[in-house]
Amino acid sequence: MGKKNSKLKQDTIDRLTTDTYFTEKEIRQWHKGFLKDCPNGLLTEQGFIKIYKQFFPDGDPSKFASLVFRVFDENNDGAIEFEEFIRALSITSRGNLDEKLHWAFRLYDVDNDGYITREEMYNIVDAIYQMVGQQPQTEDENTPQKRVDKIFDQMDKNHDDRLTLEEFREGSKADPRIVQALSLGGD
């Protein structure tokens, strides 16, 4: 593939300043850093996992990083291009709460069917528990399964064992700890 995206075109910058919360200067800075870390202009899943391992040395972030990678890789080609990277970074770092919750919903909805099942929720919660390592937990949240049960008890209003985007959004807003656990912060 060679030096894909080594020079950022002005029309790409214009599109990204419109589509993201970054300025042209910030986009250029991020692009420079992205190319430094990914000289061919592509971030692979293994590279993505390696980055996560730097931030979570006491746990195993591999599973979680792979799940996040899937959401970053919008076109599902097995690599994150700069535009995909900056769009996801814009939402996760500067998006409003609804944007962040929609992004998180996409993370949890592994099969992209518009619902989060208990199994999908367990998959993510288990990955988070593996990533952060042994952390003190309350009795009702000391295993991934207990955490999932608690989340579904709070969010699954129609008791169909799956969460819609609306149930997920409302449930997350009703319990600030869930938003915190998603590392999404506030507005």
Curated annotation (Swiss-Prot):
A lipid is attached at G2 (N-myristoyl glycine). One of its GO terms (molecular function) is calcium ion binding. Coiled coil: none annotated. The gene is Frq2. Ca(2+) 3 binds at D156, N158, D160, R162, E167. Residues 29-54, 60-95, 96-131, 143-178 form the EF-hand domain. Belongs to the recoverin family. GO terms for cellular component: cytoplasm; synaptic vesicle. The keyword Transmembrane does not apply. Plays a role in synaptic transmission and axon terminal morphology. Inhibits ric8a-mediated promotion of synapse number but does not affect ric8a-mediated neurotransmitter release. Interacts with ric8a in a Ca(2+)-independent manner. It comes from Drosophila melanogaster (Fruit fly). This is Frequenin-2. The keyword Cytoplasm applies. It comes from the Eukaryota. Changing I178M: In RNA edited version. Ca(2+) 1 binds at D73, N75, D77, A79, E84. Ca(2+) 2 binds at D109, D111, D113, Y115, E120. Disruption phenotype: Increased number of type Is boutons in neuromuscular junctions of abdominal segment 3 muscle fibers and reduced nerve-evoked excitatory junction potential. Gene3D superfamilies: EF-hand (1.10.238.10). In the embryo, highly expressed in the ventral ganglia. Keywords: Calcium, Cytoplasm, Lipoprotein, Metal-binding, Myristate, Repeat. Binds 3 calcium ions via the second, third and fourth EF-hands. Phenothiazine FD44 binds to frq2 and disrupts interaction of frq2 with ric8a. This leads to reduction of synapse number to normal levels and restoration of normal learning performance in a Drosophila model of fragile X syndrome, suggesting that the interaction interface may be a suitable target for the treatment of fragile X and other synaptopathies. It holds the Pfam family EF-hand_7. One of its GO terms (biological process) is neurotransmitter secretion. It is found in: Cytoplasm.
